[in-house]
Amino acid sequence: LSKPSLFISNHRDIVLDPALVNYALFDIGAKTVEIAVGDNLLTKEWISDLMRINKSFIVKRSEKTKRAMLTASKNLSAYIHHALTDKQQPIWIAQKEGRAKDGIDKTNSALISMLLLNKPKPMAIKDYLDELNIVPVSIAYQYDPCDQDKAKELATIETEGKYEKSEHEDINSITKGLMGYKGKIH
């Protein structure tokens, strides 16, 4: 890789997905990525510690007002651009909020909109996106240790219209995903 890249990845496992990208980069002698992590995951101290050790930065997903969300999105956009262009630091970010539970891997257009918030007005969109050096990433696991939990969540949404996570459900999913059997990975 001639310059730092923004790796936009499908999302199955917040720990292992970027770790696999880092392994591939390390294997070729390239810098490893900084990892975008949602603030919803930082409910336990050991998770916060794990994220800090792994060069993570926070994506504020829990802002309460539209103005606060816009400010957080602008700051995130500016940071990603700064990391790539000034720090020469590659970045990993999921293509959409949360893990894919339905197997549909489609980049959320809001992600691209967020990335463009930092674009100077006179600059062409294509030129700005070229600066970000976006690299799509797709990772597949033969087995998903969280598949029953994901199916239960989708079924609840289908029958009740919504799903309420328990307090540390995301953390339990991280642990199960990290420790569970995944079979072949590609």
Q: Language-model features: where?
A:
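Soluble catalytic domains of membrane acyltransferases
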Residues: 1-185
